[in-house]
């Protein structure tokens, strides 16, 4: 029995009907389908409507600030209270008081301070009625007990409404992974956010990738505080890797993170090799150690420009690490502030550091507070002071510097005309001979007078050369009149977290926070004091542009206020021509500053300083030569840092040798014999103390 073949079912089109191709003009239509019962593929046609017919309509995105047009304080307060009633949450009295005090609502308001308020999810949701109507420079959410839900909601609002340029989320330990994920999205999407303070807010392994991705791709952040954020290990590795490609971040604070001297320090050193835009790196209260400092120095050595401030306060550094740093300093061209306080460096470490500092061309501030220095170390520091025509601030507090060391420092200040602040302990040290106590007081007064003399000269030159910029003085020159009972100089912030001013600091220590000083032009929005924590470094500095015109007798130094980084001060130092008669030279056009690498011999001190080097010492001092061989250190550290220590000199005549070196440097043509006798007595006293 034969079964007749059945026709294939029709092929439905897009609308469920049979789609037949229209017959082409002039060609006969097929009389019957193919034998297999299917339509030919070539017979199908697909058509689309014209571009004008595709889009039937368009809706513009909602304007985030549509509620902020001609808004009044009463409207904001009413909307906030209504939202609290709708969400059945409590109103924040602190917020209501601030809202009532606001006047000009058309611009960014200074600060929204919610510090210490407990913010749950519903309370955060009610805040949207404020954020959709008002924008702020600073939003302070410190210690507000945020959880994942509340943090996510707040960060989404701040990102959508661009509510803040400076945000403080410190001391919120429970924002969790979702909170950090929302924070990372805010960092990536908010172009106005410049400052983020996340101190004591843990950034753990599962949250770090979100923040790292935000910092690597697109981030407008210029300042990032991550103190005590549990970064050691994988979080720091992700963060450092991302920051290699970040060109916007200027300040990075990583204190109290238990960073170690191997993997963590290697990541930081690698970061410095590739990132030349980072200006401040604060590593205080970590465990960098000498091995970690070697990695950091290796990164610094490869920088042509970049880091301006390096804070290594309390990192268990010894004289071994100072050998690495002494090799690196001649090669650094931008480092202006170096804080080594509270490290057991000792006299030997300062000797290793001295030659590098003398060959350096950029360091303006040096912190050596509580570094176990004695008179011997003070003599080495005095040699550097006598050679340096650019050092502005020096901190030597909490060291056992007695009569001999003070005498060396006093003599060095006689030939130095740049040092404006020298911090020493106010009370004299105990001496075996009671008469030396009075000698110490007299020497402290001489040192104080020397700094005041330099300060007055700098102020006079600034007023003479730059009358339009009278208010933009350096922090060292902000005091109106030196007080007779002040310490030897204004206090240099030494890097230790200090909730209250120490008794060793005077009114000049806080002068950089006064309102009469001009703000830096690039930052016209200054955060309120509730957000900006005190930075205890010696202070970031902003160097003058390399192409700025300068003459052989005039040098302009631009430095920032210590601890802020938001204010800039300018001082002009004019060097008078030598007293001896010279034939008139033809005027020369301004020349760019000489390249600092390889380092040449230090330039002559300013007017009044006497060149005491003999003809044999006029040649450039070469930097210490790296060792020829040595086993490499782990993590790819160069072998030259492994054997950087110079040979150990004999212990006997070492003290006198250092003192004699200073004696030769400070000898003057007029009172040479008198200075030699005074310095010889100081060296003998310091030698007796060390025995």
Swiss-Prot record:
Q: Which domain of life is it from?
A: Eukaryota
Write down which residues bear the modification named Phosphoserine. Answer: 50, 56, 561
Q: Where is the composition biased (Polar residues)?
A: 468-481
Q: Which GO terms describe its molecular function?
A: protein phosphatase inhibitor activity
Q: Cross-referenced InterPro entries, in alphabetical order?
A: Leu-rich_rpt, LRR_dom_sf, PP1-Reg/Actin-Interact_Protein
Q: Region (Disordered): which ranges? A: 1-43, 460-662
Q: Which Pfam families match?
A: LRR_6
Composition bias (Pro residues) maps to: 584-605, 620-634
Per UniProt, the keywords (alphabetical) are: Leucine-rich repeat, Phosphoprotein, Protein phosphatase inhibitor, Repeat
Tell me which CDD domains the record gives: LRR_RI (cd00116)
Q: Which family does it belong to?
A: Belongs to the PPP1R37 family.
Q: How is this protein organized at the quaternary level?
A: Interacts with PPP1CA.
What is the protein name for this chain?
Protein phosphatase 1 regulatory subunit 37
């Amino acid at each position: 029995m034969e079964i007749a073949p059945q026709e294939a079912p029709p092929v439905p089109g897009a609308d469920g009907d049979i789609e037949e191709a229209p017959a082409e003009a002039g060609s006969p239509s097929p009389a019957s389908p193919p034998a297999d019962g299917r339509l030919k593929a070539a017979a199908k046609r697909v058509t689309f409507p014209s571009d004008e017919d595709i889009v039937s309509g368009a809706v513009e995105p909602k304007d985030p600030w549509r509620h902020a047009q001609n808004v009044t304080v009463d409207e904001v307060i009413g909307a906030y209270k209504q939202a609290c009633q709708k969400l059945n949450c409590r109103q924040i009295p602190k917020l209501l008081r601030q809202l009532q005090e606001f006047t000009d609502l058309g611009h960014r308001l200074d600060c929204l301070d919610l510090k210490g308020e407990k913010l749950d999810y519903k309370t955060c949701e009610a805040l949207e009625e404020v954020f959709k109507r008002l924008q702020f420079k600073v939003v302070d959410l410190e210690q507000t007990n945020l959880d994942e839900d509340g943090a996510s909601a707040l960060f989404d609002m701040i990102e959508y409404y661009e509510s803040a340029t400076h945000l403080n989320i410190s001391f919120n330990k429970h924002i969790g992974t979702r909170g950090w994920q929302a924070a990372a999205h805010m960092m990536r999407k908010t172009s106005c956010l410049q400052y983020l303070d996340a101190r004591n807010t843990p950034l753990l392994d599962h949250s770090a990738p979100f923040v790292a991705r935000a910092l690597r791709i697109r981030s407008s952040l210029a300042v990032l505080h991550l103190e005590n954020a549990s970064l050691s290990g994988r979080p720091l590795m992700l963060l450092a890797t991302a920051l290699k490609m970040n060109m916007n971040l200027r300040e990075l604070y990583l204190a109290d993170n238990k960073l170690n001297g191997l993997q963590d320090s290697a990541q930081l050193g690698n970061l410095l090799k590739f990132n030349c835009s980072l200006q401040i790196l604060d590593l205080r209260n970590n465990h960098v150690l000498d091995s970690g400092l070697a990695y950091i120095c290796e990164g610094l050595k490869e920088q042509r420009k970049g880091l301006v401030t390096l804070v290594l306060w309390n990192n268990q550094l010894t004289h071994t690490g100072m050998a690495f740093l002494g090799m690196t300093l001649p090669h650094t061209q931008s480092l202006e502030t170096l804080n080594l306080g509270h490290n057991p460096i000792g006299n030997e470490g300062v000797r290793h550091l001295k030659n590098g500092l003398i060959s350096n061309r950029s360091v303006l501030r040096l912190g050596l507070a509580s570094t176990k220095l004695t008179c011997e170390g003070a003599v080495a520091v005095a040699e550097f002071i006598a050679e340096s025509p650019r050092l502005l601030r020096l901190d030597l507090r909490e060291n056992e510097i007695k009569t001999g060391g003070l005498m060396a420092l006093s003599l060095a200040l006689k030939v130095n005309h740049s040092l404006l602040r020298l911090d020493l302990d106010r009370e004299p040290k105990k001496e075996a001979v009671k008469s030396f106590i009075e000698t110490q007081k007299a020497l402290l007064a001489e040192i104080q007078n020397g700094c005041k003399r330099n300060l007055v000269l700098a102020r006079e030159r600034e007023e003479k050369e730059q009358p339009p910029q009278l208010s933009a003085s350096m922090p060292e020159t902000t005091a109106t009149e030196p007080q007779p009972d002040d310490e030897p100089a204004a206090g240099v912030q030494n890097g230790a977290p200090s909730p209250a001013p120490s008794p060793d600091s005077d009114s000049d220590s806080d002068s950089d926070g006064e309102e009469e000083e001009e703000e830096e032009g690039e930052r016209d929005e200054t955060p309120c004091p509730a957000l900006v924590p005190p930075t205890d470094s010696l202070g970031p500095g902003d160097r003058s542009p390399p192409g700025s015109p300068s003459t052989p007798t005039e040098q302009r130094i631009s430095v920032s206020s210590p601890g802020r980084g938001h204010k800039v001060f300018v001082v002009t130092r004019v060097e008078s021509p030598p007293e001896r008669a010279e034939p008139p030279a033809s005027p020369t056009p301004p020349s760019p500053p000489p390249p600092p690498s390889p380092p040449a011999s230090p330039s002559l001190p300013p007017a009044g300083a006497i060149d005491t080097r003999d003809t044999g010492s006029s040649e450039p001092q070469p930097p210490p030569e790296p060792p020829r061989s040595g086993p490499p250190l782990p993590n790819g550290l160069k072998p030259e840092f492994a054997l950087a220590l110079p040979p150990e000199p004999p212990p006997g005549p070492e003290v006198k040798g250092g003192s004699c070196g200073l004696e030769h440097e400070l000898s003057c043509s007029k009172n040479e014999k008198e200075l030699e006798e005074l310095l010889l007595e100081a060296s003998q006293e310091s030698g007796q103390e060390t025995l």
